[in-house]
């Protein structure tokens, strides 16, 4: 009888250890994927920032630089902030169990949302400026500028396109951080007054 009990304990212990190892492997895989996803925007942000910083042109019509346009200056600052946050958040996400605490989950959720809207706004206003630079606006007698400053417009366009790739990464990160936060809460429940039963809204 004692041998049988010992055997049962050993088998339960073995299965428990296997489950723990499997959970740790899954957790490590998720953490690695999230870390890589947070690192990816760093290079893109730096690329968009550098391209825009070097964007200037001088010809017989005069000189133009990214610093002459508020939207492009905002794009540079937004990409700089995004690169710094991406690097810092990737370092924190790579730490074992560091991102599992509730304050960290809330922090990632809020900052991921904030950075998504920040970079999206920078890309949107810069794209609007580029549209006017390429097409002008006949209603207010604005002529297009890109026919005279083609190189400037091409570099600005490249920077804006890269910025929208950053936005795509941050949309995915926002979805991940939202999922990690809201799966910690129980689904709301309703009370059936006729049966006096409490039923989960999303089922069992």
UniProtKB/Swiss-Prot annotation:
**Which Pfam families has this protein been placed in?**
CASP_dom
How does it sit in the bilayer? Multi-pass membrane protein
Residues the record marks as carrying a glycan: 68
Compositionally biased region (Basic and acidic residues): 1-11
Which of UniProt's keywords are assigned here?
Cell membrane, Glycoprotein, Membrane, Transmembrane, Transmembrane helix
Q: What does UniProt give as GO cellular component? A: plasma membrane
Q: Subcellular localization, per the record?
A: Cell membrane
Where exactly are the transmembrane stretches of this chain?
A: 33-53, 75-95, 114-134, 156-176
Tissue spec. comment: Expressed in the peripheral root cap and leaf epidermis.
Query: Cytoplasmic face: residue ranges?
Result: 1-32, 96-113, 177-204
Q: Where is this region: Disordered?
A: 1-21
Entry's family note:
Belongs to the Casparian strip membrane proteins (CASP) family.
Q: Which NCBIfam families match?
A: A_tha_TIGR01569
Q: How does it assemble?
A: Homodimer and heterodimers.
Would you tell me the protein name for this molecule? CASP-like protein 2A1
């Amino acid at each position: 009888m004692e041998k049988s009990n010992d055997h049962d304990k050993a088998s339960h212990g073995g299965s428990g250890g296997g489950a723990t190892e499997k959970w740790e492997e899954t957790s490590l895989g998720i953490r690695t994927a999230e870390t890589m996803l947070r690192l990816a925007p760093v290079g893109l942000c730096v690329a968009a920032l550098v391209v825009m910083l070097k964007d200037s042109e001088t010809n017989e019509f005069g000189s133009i630089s990214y610093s002459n346009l508020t939207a492009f200056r905002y794009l540079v600052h937004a990409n700089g902030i995004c690169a710094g946050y991406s690097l810092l958040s990737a370092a924190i996400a790579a730490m074992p169990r560091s991102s599992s605490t509730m304050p960290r989950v809330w922090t990632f959720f809020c900052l991921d949302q904030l950075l998504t809207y920040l970079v999206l706004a920078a890309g949107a206003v810069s794209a609007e400026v580029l549209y006017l630079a390429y097409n002008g606006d006949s209603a207010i007698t604005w002529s297009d500028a890109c026919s005279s400053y083609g190189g400037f417009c091409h570099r600005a366009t490249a920077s804006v396109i890269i910025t929208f790739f950053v936005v795509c990464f941050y949309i995915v990160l926002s979805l991940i951080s939202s999922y990690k936060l809201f799966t910690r809460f129980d689904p709301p429940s309703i009370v059936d007054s006729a049966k006096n039963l409490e039923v989960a809204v999303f089922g069992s």
